[in-house]
Amino acid sequence: MTPLDVTIRRVERADLLSVVRIERACFSDPWPYDAFERLLDEPAFLVAEREGEVVGYVIADAMPNHGRDIGHVKDLAVHPEARGEGLGRGLLRSALARLRGVGVAVVRLEVRESNAVARSLYADEGFEPVRRVSNYYRDGEDALVLVVDLAEWTTGA
């Protein structure tokens, strides 16, 4: 779980510069500001805040799918100086709970095959690999597509 001094809450427009700074610190091919701006209204665009500073974020959306809505974790990052404290897990769990609350049944995400830390977190939360996508990332690295059934996640969490 997240440390007691951290609050996980919905993103606000005023948080976007901090979110972009974290994105740039964490990823070699960061999203631009306007990508985050377009996602402000997603049901699970959440930030982790400590002492007034945003230290991490998660973005997840929901898509109708014939009565079995599908969620998609689009982005999850924790500032390098705040890693190892459970913030990523807290953000992920909060996003999954929000998606479940809006009727999502299954959640998917893509992760770099080489990102062992993220893959371990996702496996701990019940995500299972369903396929590999060759050359998914701009640098040519493959992605693994992972999924979790939220009914199973809820009973196992």
Q: Where are the regions a protein language model picked out?
A:
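Conserved beta-strand edge residues that scaffold enzyme active sites
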Residues: Y33, E37, E113, Y136-Y137
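Acetyl-CoA-dependent GNAT
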Residues: P3, R10-E81, L92-S94, R98-V102, ...
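Terminal substrate-recognition subdomain of acyl/acetyltransferases
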Residues: M1-T2, N135, G140-A157
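Active-site acidic-Proline motif in GNAT/NAT acetyltransferases
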Residues: H79-E81, E85, E113-S114
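Short glycine/proline-centered loop/turn elements that form peptide/ligand docking sites
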Residues: G88, L92, N115-A118, N135-G140
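Short coil/turn segments at alpha/beta junctions that flank glycine-rich nucleotide-binding fingerprints
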Residues: E85, V102-A105
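Conserved catalytic-core motifs of GNAT/GCN5-like acyltransferases
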Residues: R108-E110, A123, E128-V145
